[in-house]
Amino acid sequence: MSLLTLFPAILSFIAVSVPDEGRDMYDAFVNKLANSFVSVSYEYETEISGVKVVGEGNLFLQGRCYRYDADGLTVCSDSRSIWIADQAAREMVIEPVDESSLAVNPATLLVNLAGAFTVKSTKKAGDGVVIYHLLPAVSFGISECSITLAASGTQGASCAAPVLQKASFITDDGIAFSLVIKSVTFEEPSRSPEFFLPSGTDSDWVVTDLR
């Protein structure tokens, strides 16, 4: 699976076991995330075979549905199926949601909050800012992860919930991936499943439907 397709896991694979320091902010973030339509704009950086790779993307989450776009790759799910579209190649693969695979269906954990991550430790990084070091409770391609949350009103956080500022993770094969969150917005969860479906395809596209 592409590194880019792991990003929703950073938001979704969240355990409820948190050390006392930062617990209230962490719980508030999880609750807001699970009960909102969430929009995230981010920049990412990684290194593959000695080559630095940078890019940016946008992610939308609501319950078990999600859609994100990053450098020509679009991945969508309406909770029943997953669409993976390569805009440059004009190719799309459609697969059924695999309820047993956290990496394929990361948004499932927004509803269930199954403990895919446990919090190993926390560290203050400024007034109202906490770094959470996470370890996977199950195997899904990420060996370790950290997220940085800022309390509302601190260091650029302007919404009513704690804000995800940064995230980083290391895959099982040792590739490090870091993200800087440009913006996060929370709205009422009023989007229909159709909002998350892909658009802009025509008869020139090669579509492989594996459902």
Please name every model-derived segment.
Residues 3, 7-53, 64, 199-211:
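N-terminal leader/targeting segments and the immediate start of mature chains
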Residues 29-32, 56-60, 64, 71-76, ...:
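Short linear motifs in intrinsically disordered
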Residues 35-39, 54, 63, 77-79, ...:
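Extracytoplasmic
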Residues 43-47, 69, 85-87, 135-137, ...:
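A generic structural motif
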Residues 51-53, 62, 69, 113-116, ...:
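Residues that act as N-cap/strand-start positions at coil-to-secondary-structure junctions
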Residues 56-104, 174-177:
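An acidic-aromatic
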Residues 83-141:
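Surface-exposed, polar helix/loop patches in the mature regions of secreted/periplasmic/lumenal proteins
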Residues 115-117, 121-203, 208-209:
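Gly/Pro-enriched, hydrophobic low-complexity segments
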